[in-house]
Amino acid sequence: MNFLLSKLLLGLIRFYQYCISPLIPPRCRYTPTCSQYAVEAVKKYGAFKGLRLAIKRIARCHPFGGHGHDPVP
């Protein structure tokens, strides 16, 4: 189950990276970008924990949040 959800999430993230992201200006304040962070988190921790980490990261990515290098733990 976790494997299938991971593949589904990775597919959705890749769709965003290749089809939607090029149409909007870059805004991510971190490296790696939030979408790349999500890919790495899902690959490393699986669908549930990876998605939780990605959501927390996206919630921190705003003008008043942090910035800089923030790798997947």
Curated annotation (Swiss-Prot):
Signal peptide: none annotated. The keyword Cell division does not apply. InterPro entries: Membr_insert_effic_factor_YidD (IPR002696). It is a peripheral membrane protein. The keyword Membrane applies. It is found in: Cell inner membrane. GO terms for cellular component: plasma membrane. Pfam families: YidD. Keywords: Cell inner membrane, Cell membrane, Membrane. Belongs to the UPF0161 family. Could be involved in insertion of integral membrane proteins into the membrane. HAMAP family: UPF0161_YidD (MF_00386). NCBIfam families: membrane protein insertion efficiency factor YidD (TIGR00278). This is Putative membrane protein insertion efficiency factor. It comes from Neisseria gonorrhoeae (strain ATCC 700825 / FA 1090).
